[in-house]
Regions:
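A conserved acidic, glycine/proline-rich C-terminal tail/linker
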Residues: 247-267
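A short, sequence-level motif marking secondary-structure junctions
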Residues: 242-249, 281-287
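One-carbon transfer enzymes
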Residues: 1-231, 237, 262-278, 284-288, ...
Length: 315
């Protein structure tokens, strides 16, 4: 029997927990949720399993550590938990503290990885189970799985793929740990540096129309709803550019970026830094409802910044 402490939040955790509890060789001893949120699904799981559910402002505090030591667990697992885990809590369990990260470590450490892999135009993304150490996503790798990204995948599609892949990879890693066959691969043996991705914040969602068309295409799908959506301004109002298509054989030429330079039955053609891109769906930024495309005319212009967007009568 492998006795597990589960530090977790959200759909990532729900899928993983569902798979773990199907195996009679695994026993969840307690569940620790984020202090700043309420995960009703994990609350119900704790009741169903008959295990305590903890919420603590600082899981590294002495009182919390003493409390969970009593459970005599074999391993602690982190799945979308948001507190830094210091040395003392990492060493409570004999098999250590492991984390499941939706990134192909040592690349794509950090935050908002599924957004970044799409923005970067990747053809696949990784899911990695690794030991937690003093760094951020730098611990030795136990197991890694690569997942294909299709050309039409958007942020929501990757989330669904990642929920399943994380659950599968974590489950396999726990099986290996129980059997004593788990690997321990230092990340610097894969690449000497790897790289980190920053947390995306408000203000990062605006399209720079001077980017080339492929970059705009990847940006739009990379932060599509349920993300914030790729934003732009038109006649002083904010809109979400929800879907775009690359235009085959579109020549490169110089013109004012953001200008609407054509229309078709599919949408509007907007000038980019390289050539032009077809915008097929625009949403109202407040209601998220689709806008009628006949309200956008050739010669009108999209802007990345409201403060440089001329008054409507000048557009």
């Amino acid at each position: 029997m492998l006795k597990i402490g589960f530090f977790a939040d959200g759909p990532w955790a729900h899928k993983s927990l569902e798979k773990i509890i199907e195996n009679d060789d695994f026993q969840i001893m307690y569940i620790v949720v984020r202090y700043d949120s309420v995960d009703k699904v994990l609350v119900e799981y704790a009741k169903r399993l008959g295990v305590p559910l903890f919420k603590h402002r600082n899981v590294n505090s002495g009182d919390f550590i003493q409390m969970i030591k009593k459970f005599d667990i074999d391993i602690n697992v982190s799945m979308s938990f948001n507190q830094i885990l210091k040395k003392e809590i990492r060493e409570i369990a004999p098999l250590g503290f492991i984390n499941c990260h939706a990134g192909a470590l040592p690349f794509y450490r950090g935050r908002n990885i599924l957004n970044w892999v799409l923005i970067n135009g990747e053809k696949e993304f990784g899911v990695t189970v690794h030991y937690v150490d003093d760094g951020i996503d730098t611990g030795d790798i136990i197991l890694q799985q690569m997942v294909e990204i299709s050309p039409d995948d958007r942020y929501g599609d990757l989330l669904e793929k990642a929920y399943i892949a994380c659950a599968d990879t974590l489950y396999k890693a726990l099986c290996q740990l129980k059997q004593g066959t788990a690997k321990r691969i230092p990340q610097n043996t894969i690449h000497s540096t790897g790289f980190y991705c920053s947390r995306r914040v408000m203000g990062d969602e605006y399209i720079d129309w001077s980017w080339d068309s492929e970059r705009i295409y990847n940006f739009v799908r990379g932060i599509a709803i349920p993300g914030p959506g790729a934003r732009t301004f038109f006649k002083g109002e904010e809109y979400i550019i929800d879907k775009v298509e690359l235009i085959n054989d579109m020549p490169c030429y110089i013109d004012k970026v953001g200008n609407i330079v054509g229309k078709s039955t599919s949408g509007i053609v907007v000038k980019t830094g390289s050539n032009a891109i077809l915008v097929t769906r625009v949403l109202n930024a407040d209601t998220k409802e689709a806008c009628a495309m006949n309200g956008f005319y050739i010669g009108n212009r999209f802007f990345a910044d409201k403060h440089i967007c001329p008054p409507p009568e000048h557009l």
